[in-house]
């Protein structure tokens, strides 16, 4: 049983994006002690891309005795690229191709790309096998972006990136298939919270979308990047924690206490 029936201290991070040094600094500052049996680390997806230490991130997390790893859309991009055997332009701009190089211990993009990606996926497979789509405690649900929803009556078939997409709450979200979970990893969670799509009775903790966007939505700041607020954003029974590490050089650590489900 994970955690047993006692209160545990949960240290929650998201969107590490290959920044191992920043992760360790943030956890140390928050008081995380991997030797403490009451301390658990929960990562809300997007462990790789953009930073230059994806292997260090993967090695550190896989060796932690108490952790929960959540799958994000960048893990989806990485798997898709490796299975495809070649990089699309967005894989180059997102840093996914570079992640494969770093995980595969390749210095430069050269040679047989499919071999590079096969090697990277072999090294990453034990890590990927540990990832969940969500994790639930007595009072919280941890996801990368959101839980799977259902299309609303006015849905026009447009995909996740459409700004005017409106969904409805899915009471059977726990039974969603992987395609539905993959779709849920891409939307704007602050917009979904604004549409009152959290009817779970619990607080949804997410990353994916920089928390400054939520603060701007609430009128706490005027811009998402200039003079922005990067602290966790509490909004309609949700908490957004993505600090946009590639921009800020920092990672938020949300520390909460809760009981695991029996």
Descriptions of predicted regions:
Residues 255-259:
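Short beta-strand-to-coil "C-cap" segments at the C-terminal boundary of structured domains/repeats
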Residues 15, 46, 61, 72-73, ...:
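Divalent metal-coordination and catalytic microenvironments
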Residues 37-38, 54-138, 168-171:
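Active-site neighborhood of divalent metal-dependent phosphoester bond hydrolases
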Residues 100-101, 106-239, 244-249, 260:
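Acidic, His/Gly-enriched loop-helix segments that form or flank divalent-metal centers
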Residues 4-6, 34-36, 63, 195-200, ...:
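Flexible, charged surface loops at secondary-structure boundaries
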Residues 1-59:
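N-terminal active-site segment of His-dependent metallophosphoesterases
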Residues 17-18, 49, 75-76, 147, ...:
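Short, glycine/acidic-enriched loop or turn micro-motifs at the edges of active sites
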Residues 12, 41-43, 69-70, 141, ...:
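Residue-level marker for buried hydrophobic side chains located in beta-strands
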